[in-house]
Curated annotation (Swiss-Prot):
InterPro entries (alphabetical): NA-bd_OB-fold (IPR012340), Rib_uL2_dom2 (IPR014722), Ribosomal_uL2 (IPR002171), Ribosomal_uL2_bac/org-type (IPR005880), Ribosomal_uL2_C (IPR022669), Ribosomal_uL2_CS (IPR022671), Ribosomal_uL2_dom3 (IPR014726), Ribosomal_uL2_RNA-bd_dom (IPR022666)
PROSITE patterns according to UniProt: RIBOSOMAL_L2
Location of the protein in the cell: Plastid, Chloroplast
Organism: Marchantia polymorpha
Keyword hit for Disulfide bond: no
Ribosomal protein keyword on record: yes
Chief localisation class: plastid
Identification of the protein by name: Large ribosomal subunit protein uL2c
GO biological process: translation
């Protein structure tokens, strides 16, 4: 993924960088694979803010991505590599031999007219999907299922990759991008390779307007709000929060308090927690 740097001909471009989009094909998305996306703007069905700092943004069409990869034993060809406004990575349009078309996540290194397949005995090549039990140790994978047949739920962000580090019985041990080491059933499917756009974390937005295009609004500190708006608000002048511990706008513990449930069913499958938890 190449990065384009701007000259400082305006304050907004002084530190701005964007992808060069060398890999993608300029084309319209498939109509049958798109539908309108309702932007919730951080509100629930009653209009109450449940997630702050969201709203606005450019209109988007949602591209339906094939996370299940359940079209087995039929080869498909990479027709296009397209931009997707709903995620940081690109997507690929697959033309299958029977005429069906589907979108998949863009694996790093795949090229136009390459062939992919999903089956139990698929070769270990980039873009192919097969069960974890048929993959050798050390294989780099993405779009990993947690429950067999449910579709990929892990390792779908730009530049991410997981590795198979052990097999024992009916379980496979994976090292996830977060540093977590987790057990997954050998029957689960995964796709070979790393997700594209590995340098997405090196991009610099450059100006506040670019954040607004993405639907992200300014963040206001709770300590400068009124007491009705935030538990940290109020006071005369610059005052401390006035509480023993920091709280969220809804009064729950914040800044370091773990929100994961105790005795969750998957605790026995997590051998090591992620690095930042």
């Amino acid at each position: 993924m190449a990065i384009r740097l701007y000259r400082a001909y305006t304050p907004g471009t002084r530190n701005r960088s964007v992808p060069k989009f060398d890999e993608i094909v300029k084309c319209q998305p498939q109509k049958k694979l798109t539908y309108n996306k309702h932007i919730k703007k951080g509100r629930n069905n009653r209009g109450i803010i449940t997630s702050q700092h969201r709203g606005g943004g450019h209109k988007r069409l949602y591209r339906k991505i094939d996370f299940q990869r359940n079209k087995k034993y039929i080869t498909g060809k990479i027709k296009t590599i397209e931009y997707d406004p709903n995620r940081n990575t690109y997507i690929c349009l697959i033309n299958y031999e029977d005429g069906e078309k589907r979108y998949i996540l863009y694996p790093r290194g795949i090229k136009l007219d390459d062939t992919i397949i999903s089956s139990e005995e698929a070769p270990i090549l980039i873009g192919n999907t097969l069960p974890l039990t048929n993959m050798p140790l050390g294989t780099a994978i993405h779009n990993i299922e947690i429950t067999p047949g449910k579709g990929g739920q892990l390792v779908r962000a730009a530049g991410t990759v997981a590795k198979i580090i052990a097999k024992e019985g009916q379980l496979v041990t994976l090292r996830l991008p977060s540093g977590e080491i987790r057990l997954i059933s050998q029957k689960c499917l995964a796709t070979i390779g790393q997700i594209g756009n590995v340098d997405v974390n090196n991009l610099r937005i450059g100006k506040a307007g670019s954040k607004r295009w993405l639907g992200k609004r300014p963040k206001v500190r709770g300590v400068v709000m009124n007491p009705i708006d935030h538990p940290h608000g109020g006071g005369e002048g610059r005052a401390p929060i006035g509480r023993k511990k920091p709280l969220t706008p809804w009064g729950h513990p914040a800044l370091g308090k773990r929100s994961r449930k105790n005795n969750k069913y998957s605790d026995t499958l997590i051998l090591r927690r992620r690095k930042n938890s």
